[in-house]
């Protein structure tokens, strides 16, 4: 039996743009995609902290270092520019593998620059995770 387990997330990202007439998806800065262990075309769940909306879509490559978080197509109706969102991926795992799995969390600032990256379970709260400056 396989379980659907939380794999990774980009936490507290800010929506930078919305394009209702573009094919449905979410465009994400590839630096953030890589840091979170996500991939282009991967299915994601998006949670809007401002209005409570939750929806699924897939990742499109955004320009590296741009901080782009753009909702496209129908998803553009579920968030406004400036809204805070969480972008989550899941993976299928056998129960034994899932027991030891530690999801990746990428915390970003208001401009979608990474502040902290950590494996959930290494720290009890995001506040205890070292910042990127502390890791180097």
Swiss-Prot record:
CDD domains registered for this protein in UniProt: Asp_decarbox
Subcellular location: Cytoplasm
Binding, substrate: 57, 73-75
Principal location class: cytoplasm
Domain of life: Bacteria
Post-translational modifications: Is synthesized initially as an inactive proenzyme, which is activated by self-cleavage at a specific serine bond to produce a beta-subunit with a hydroxyl group at its C-terminus and an alpha-subunit with a pyruvoyl group at its N-terminus.
Disordered: region residues: 117-136
GO biological process: alanine biosynthetic process; pantothenate biosynthetic process
Gene3D superfamilies per the UniProt record, alphabetical: 2.40.40.20
Catalysed transformations (reactions): L-aspartate + H(+) = beta-alanine + CO2
Active site: 25, 58
Classification via Pfam families: Asp_decarbox
Disulfide bonds: none
Record GO terms (molecular function): aspartate 1-decarboxylase activity
Cofactor comment text: Binds 1 pyruvoyl group covalently per subunit.
Entry keywords, A to Z: Autocatalytic cleavage, Cytoplasm, Decarboxylase, Lyase, Pantothenate biosynthesis, Pyruvate, Schiff base, Zymogen
InterPro entries linked to this entry: Asp_de-COase-like_dom_sf (IPR009010), Asp_decarbox (IPR003190)
Signal sequence, renumbered to the chain: none
Role according to the record: Catalyzes the pyruvoyl-dependent decarboxylation of aspartate to produce beta-alanine.
Subunit structure: Heterooctamer of four alpha and four beta subunits.
Listed name of the protein: Aspartate 1-decarboxylase
Organism annotation: Chloroherpeton thalassium (strain ATCC 35110 / GB-78)
């Amino acid at each position: 039996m396989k379980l659907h387990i939380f794999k990774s997330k980009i936490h507290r990202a800010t929506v930078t743009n919305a394009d209702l007439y573009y094919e449905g998806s979410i465009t994400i800065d590839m630096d953030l995609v890589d840091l979170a262990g996500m991939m282009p075309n991967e299915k994601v769940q998006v949670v809007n902290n401002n209005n409570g909306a939750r929806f699924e879509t897939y990742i499109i490559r955004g320009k590296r270092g741009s901080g782009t978080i753009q909702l496209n197509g129908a998803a553009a109706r579920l968030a406004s520019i400036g809204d805070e969102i969480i972008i989550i991926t899941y993976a299928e795992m056998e129960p034994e593998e899932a027991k030891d799995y530690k999801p990746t969390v990428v915390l970003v600032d208001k401009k979608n620059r990474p502040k902290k990256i950590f494996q959930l379970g290494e720290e009890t709260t995001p506040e205890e995770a070292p910042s990127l400056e502390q890791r180097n």
